Regions:
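Extended alpha-helical coiled-coil/bundle linker/stalk regions that scaffold oligomerization
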Residues: 244-314, 318
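Glycine-rich dinucleotide-binding loop and its adjacent helix/turn
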Residues: 14, 20, 24-27, 77-141, ...
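Short hydrophobic core segments
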Residues: 71-86, 121-124, 262-274
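Glycine-rich active-site loop/strand segments that organize a redox cofactor
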Residues: 1-30, 149-212
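C-terminal, flexible cofactor-proximal segment of oxidoreductases
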Residues: 96-98, 308-437
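C-terminal catalytic lobe of FAD-dependent flavoproteins
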Residues: 200-277, 374-434
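Feature captures the FAD/FMN-dependent oxidoreductase FAD-binding
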Residues: 10-88, 206-209, 216, 223-252, ...
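Rossmann-like dinucleotide/flavin-binding elements
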Residues: 109-156, 302-358
Length: 437
């Protein structure tokens, strides 16, 4: 699960085992070693691509090293796999001198520094990073005060319902492909609130009173119960600052409210990593078909790992220009309609996969180690695959329409956006994609 191509894990653990950060990094090294046995790999760590241009069937890359060296590379094809461009989170900048502001990227929640303290911890961020951090603190330091500032709240896919363990893999749970298919049938471009409620109530788990966010994160029911029982306080707001005034220390929130906290409290920045950096727009494939770009500004599938896998196959099959994939400017849409974002992305994924499945050899899908349906024994993924292939023509016949300028969804008016482009080569004059059967 979650690997490169069809390269298997070597941990020797049960399939339900959750790999640690170090084990994931070791697996990446293993994947590179396996790839080196198949093709020639030249490593240029410390180098960065500055620019590229195409001329006479050649792609010319200009690269620079960390020490200022220049290198020009000529190739027939170029794959720019920058992905989500995730960078570590810095600690939140706060005015107070009486708190300890840290980031889980630079401060181990189970490390000596945190262990030597017994002051309260404020976890800022209600997404998956916040949940994992809160869970680590609650289980590592029983009885310690741990608080959560959860923003507008988040719901998660229930690991127990999507990836049941043991014998339930044969008869329990629901395959992810089936959920995406149902999501694609339900979402019409205007009913994101209804779809969110259906998805949350049927396959989700959550601990906050409101759940305004969903980003495909997984959480088990036991993890959720442990966190909910171990939290001292949950505040549905956003931290703006921590200030010292009148002899006290206050957390200041976006709403204008404040909360007096104990001096020496820890503030842990868990505000997330995804779709935060404003990368410049770039189409997923160049006009010549020689350059493929894997990043969220022209997303064709829900995860950049899937994009890298399938777009690379289309590139080397010389079909990357022939298959009319839709692209989605994911960061742009998320800024303009966070509520509609995950369901638009899910519908887009099913539509594009329905086009890809008709354009590549079956082996491409059979060798895809990213396929989450592989969690289940062979008979179950096979039956879902048959349903998907049978339903592919229905997804392929979805059409684009204009969302009326006065339309409101989820109680909020929505401005025009260029977030979705059809076929990439001829962007439609309509501002928003509306899926219609």
């Amino acid at each position: 699960m979650f690997t490169a191509g069809n390269i298997k894990w070597t941990l020797g653990q049960d399939r339900s085992y959750l790999a640690t950060k170090d084990e994931v990094l070791i697996h990446f090294d293993h994947c590179l070693d396996v790839v080196k046995q198949r093709v020639q790999v030249d490593e240029y760590f410390g180098w960065a691509l500055e620019s590229h241009d195409e001329s006479d069937g050649i792609v010319r890359l200009t690269c620079t090293s960390s020490d200022g060296q220049l290198m020009v590379v000529e190739a027939k094809r170029l794959i720019k796999a920058s992905g989500f461009g995730v960078v570590p989170n810095d600690p939140l900048e706060v005015s107070s001198a009486r708190v300890v502001s840290v980031s889980p990227d630079f401060c181990d929640m189970r490390g000596d520094e945190m262990r030597a303290s017994d002051t309260p911890v404020w976890v800022v961020g209600g997404g998956k990073t916040g949940m994992d951090t809160a869970h680590a603190l609650i289980t590592e330091y029983p009885g310690r005060e741990v608080n959560l500032v959860a923003g507008s709240g988040t719901f998660f896919s229930s690991r127990d319902r999507l990836f049941p363990a043991g014998g339930r893999r044969w008869w329990g749970g629901t395959l992810v492909t089936g959920i995406f298919m149902e999501l694609g049938r339900r979402f019409d471009g205007t009913n994101e609130t209804d779809v969110a409620t259906w998805l949350r109530d049927t396959y989700g788990t959550w601990l906050t009173p409101t759940t305004g966010n969903y980003l495909l994160g997984l959480l088990s029911e036991s993890e959720n119960k442990t966190i909910a029982a171990g939290l001292t306080e949950v505040i549905m707001d956003h931290v703006v600052d921590a200030v010292d005034r009148n002899g006290e220390t206050d957390l200041v929130f976006r709403s204008g409210l404040a909360k007096t906290i104990q001096p020496g409290s820890w503030i842990v920045n868990c505000t997330g990593y995804m779709l935060r950096d404003d990368q410049p727009y770039e189409p997923y494939v160049s006009d010549s078909g020689a350059v493929v770009s894997v990043q969220p500004r022209s997303a064709t599938l829900h995860l950049t790992s899937y994009m890298g896998y399938f777009l690379t196959h289309l590139l080397f099959l010389d079909k990357i220009r022939d298959v009319p994939l839709y692209e989605l400017d994911a960061p742009d849409l998320r800024k303009k309609s966070n509520a509609a974002f995950p369901y638009t992305l899910g519908s887009l994924t099913m539509h594009n996969l329905s086009l890809i499945v008709d354009s590549v050899p079956n082996k491409v899908f059979l060798d895809c180690g990213l396929d989450l349906d592989r969690w289940y024994p062979p008979p179950r993924p096979t039956s879902t695959s048959i349903l998907f292939v049978g339903g592919a023509p229905r997804f392929a016949k979805l059409t684009c329409g204009v969302r009326s300028s006065g339309h409101t969804a989820g109680g909020e008016s929505r401005r025009s956006t260029k977030s979705v482009r059809a076929g990439r080569r001829q962007p439609p004059p309509v501002p928003v994609l509306v899926m219609r059967r």
